[in-house]
């Protein structure tokens, strides 16, 4: 199978949307307002924190606000000086600073960034643990959610054929949906999805 035809290719995974109803979005935005637009999206690895942050930024943009995104990689204890300068330059009340992976920052870097972001109208971060800011949303995963995502990617019939494997994948990757979907990409790339058990299953 060509990589671009794989139903679990990166571009198809990125096209998935966070599972939140219109009413859920209204409640989330109302809570963000109650928290003074300074809050954290919390959850384990692969639970959709980045996706929710990106979609929240897009929603805020439709409300006339300007989302300013900073993404921190694993082990990045402080943002690159040029990235930090670009993020914080000219911040005003209409800007909302979004920091993906804020818990990667060391205490001094986090304190400095938080102070600098006071000029902005908001600060929303993602973190694996609570405590950086009041919690806006806690992301979680389940086998049912994994099955729902797989159904969207491959269709109901094929997803049903995969269903017996999904619990094993979910457990193997400790609930990390991103890792589970990556494993399905490898499986589809190697052979038809319905052929034989998962390696190690």
Regions found by a protein language model. Name each.
Residues 71, 87-109:
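Conserved P-loop NTPase "ATPase switch" module shared by AAA+ and STAND
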Residues 1-36, 186-201:
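A short, basic N-terminal segment
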Residues 35-54:
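Walker A/P-loop nucleotide-binding motif
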Residues 138-164:
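Conserved small helical "lid"/interfacial subdomain of P-loop NTPases
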Residues 163-201:
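Amphipathic alpha-helical "lid/sensor" segments that cap RecA-like P-loop NTPase cores
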Residues 104-143:
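Sensor-1/coupling segment of RecA-like P-loop NTPase cores
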Residues 62-91:
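AAA+/P-loop NTPase substrate/partner-engagement loops
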Residues 50-65:
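P-loop NTPase Walker A phosphate-binding motif
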């Amino acid at each position: 199978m060509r990589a671009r035809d794989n139903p679990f290719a990166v571009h198809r995974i990125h096209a998935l949307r966070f599972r939140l109803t219109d009413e859920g979005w209204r409640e989330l935005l109302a809570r963000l307002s109650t928290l003074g637009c300074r809050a954290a999206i919390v959850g384990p690895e692969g639970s959709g924190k980045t996706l929710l942050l990106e979609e929240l930024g897009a929603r805020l943009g439709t409300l006339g606000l300007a989302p300013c995104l900073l993404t921190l990689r694993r082990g990045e204890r402080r943002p690159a000086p040029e990235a930090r300068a670009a993020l914080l330059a000219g911040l005003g009340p209409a800007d909302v600073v979004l920091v993906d992976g804020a818990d990667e920052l060391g205490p001094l870097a986090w304190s400095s960034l938080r102070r600098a972001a006071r000029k902005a109208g908001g600060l929303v971060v993602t973190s694996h643990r609570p405590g950086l800011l009041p919690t806006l949303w806690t992301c979680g995963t389940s086998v049912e959610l994994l099955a729902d995502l797989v159904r969207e990617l491959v269709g109901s019939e094929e997803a049903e054929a995969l269903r017996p494997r999904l619990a094993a994948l979910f457990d193997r990757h400790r609930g990390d949906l991103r890792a589970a979907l990556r494993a399905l990409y490898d499986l589809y790339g190697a052979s038809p999805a319905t052929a034989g058990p998962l390696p190690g299953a």
